[in-house]
């Protein structure tokens, strides 16, 4: 267990009696602490913060290693302090803890607003609902922070971006599909100023090629909350293995299976008391979820099809079928399953409101609340940010028309995605500090949940508990989260689905003889070791986010495992290039002595670097 506790409290500047308002205290080790013990820990946190600020007034965080644990403290808002305790064995990874802790707060503020604007009693409840599940899920995954790539250790505003071949060829023209979306969605007479922005992401499920993963584009350069929205979306995909309506609605969670809970109980030599609250919640769940459960039972037992009359009155679900049930023929999806609204007012009204609309606090010119819809087309996820005063967004005819325009635009994208596919004998990461964008070919971690994994499962809040209660099956392995999708079936029968150039006629991935990364064949444990090595290298440099008068710094290291690592940093970007000099197949040729350190990595690296070194974000 990596994370031990999380604390959030308010300590006003004019506080004279040295007391504070405790808003959240959660011990993830399940230890029960008295009020005095909690106050002692808060006293340690406050003392650490004051001591660190005596030496530097500009720090927005404090990190210290104690005897039994390490601690991070952030001032997330004026007088609001967020602290995280974690095991000393993971202390070398503390920059990743810092970034994730800061992002956890950012996700809270995006969904609920600033803490200072929320009444304390309400705030305490919201903090428990957000922070506790967030860190409980992380603790369920062994070596979670060790598996995170180095980009998660630099800055909380860094988010992954797709890489395109034309950018590397010094071509920066706006593509046809971007023009189409801009003219027909954002600048149309009906939508102008009502749809604030459209953010487009490519999040393939296979996660084999990091160059094709992440943010693609948005259209408003004043959208300052883009890093937070992007990291929230990528975080859902990484934790749950996919982006679904349930994940976007916040009703999906990762939990241990009953078998794993029993194993944990045996190891602890004691049984957990029955959760009376869970039983009571199951009995008192909303009738709408019960109807969904009955529908599922009807599918399983072949009875009670009378509910079809009710469901036909609502937009249809992509019904309860999994690939394992459909056989080999399910590899190729029907056209109607290729695209759908994930979050929209067209989702069934008996679902929680978060399935119809997400309301996020975002910053353009100012900080305000906006409505967000989510739409998917194959591996593309589109976030549509809408002004809250725009009422037509709830009309079915408008949403059908909007989907038509999104479909046309993304279809143009799939006709020629233009991803960078050139084979490289090295890997790299380029981080642009001001924009928060990073481009990488190094494999990134993604949670690969499957039915053979008996330790963890995905569940949907409310619905899975109901199915377990009504079917009297405590060991129900399958979850609604793994076999269903909430989406409005709005089939555009007049338009064929464009084929993906990266897939064959049967819908499966084409095999490419050229590897996208020199580390593409690493297993999970090897990827952990790679990230450990890279964190050691980053730890030898000053983790500077942005400073205007810095000179360019560079460093070259040769590691015992055959890796040659080049590190360059200036006020604009941070560059990391990795090459395996044990298996470098390029012929070594003598050349004139050069003052450029990067040329020692080989001609392939220097040629690539000279082509992209002066670029803006790719």
Swiss-Prot record:
Superkingdom assignment: Eukaryota
Ranges of compositional bias, category Basic and acidic residues: 502-515
Gene Ontology, cellular component aspect: Mon1-Ccz1 complex; multivesicular body membrane; vacuolar membrane
Pfam family, one: Intu_longin_1
Keywords attached to this entry: Autophagy, Endosome, Membrane, Protein transport, Transport, Vacuole
PANTHER family, A to Z: VACUOLAR FUSION PROTEIN CCZ1 HOMOLOG-RELATED (PTHR13056:SF0)
Role summary: In complex with MON1, is required for multiple vacuole delivery pathways including the cytoplasm to vacuole transport (Cvt), autophagy, pexophagy and endocytosis. The MON1-CCZ1 complex acts at the fusion of vesicles with the vacuole, through its regulation of the SNARE complex during the coordinated priming and docking stages of fusion, and particularly at the stage of tethering/docking.
Family: Belongs to the CCZ1 family.
This protein's name: Vacuolar fusion protein CCZ1
Organism of derivation: Kluyveromyces lactis (strain ATCC 8585 / CBS 2359 / DSM 70799 / NBRC 1267 / NRRL Y-1140 / WM37)
